[in-house]
Amino acid sequence: MIRLMQESDVDHVAAIECLVQTHPWSKQQFQESLVSHQCTVYEQANQVVGFCILQPVLDEANLLLMAIHPSQQGKGLGYALLDYSIEQLKNNPIQIFLEVRESNRAAIRLYEKAQFHQIDLRKNYYPNGDGSREHAVIMVRTCTDDFAALFQ
């Protein structure tokens, strides 16, 4: 079941975040996101196994964070969660932006399947645990067939 994130989900969401990110968000950041962002979770057998945080901004949105528990990856849950979360955006965005580590090929494939495409590369953006840095792939999904709306 996919539903809106609740404050009682924050511990589970933060635990998943720690499993998949080298620089995870804090519990406080997740709690603050509940106020101003659209936060959804994927729940199976009363257990949160994934989450998605979208930031609506005027007529656009930013995908800030998304993760599926490693034991549940590769089962289509991420695509279902992303698709549902985008459909629930109340601002009907013209475009949705995201950035992802260049090495995160599984996430890039998921985003491409969800109709995102690369528009830029932010060099040396993400810090790695060993002190090196990694490029961020900037992607966008256009949510309108009205080409003129992109330039208003």
Language model region names:
Residues 31, 103, 125-126:
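Conserved beta-strand edge residues that scaffold enzyme active sites
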Residues 47, 66-83, 101-109, 113-114, ...:
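Conserved glycine-rich acetyl-CoA-binding loop
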Residues 59, 97-99, 117-134:
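Conserved catalytic-core motifs of GNAT/GCN5-like acyltransferases
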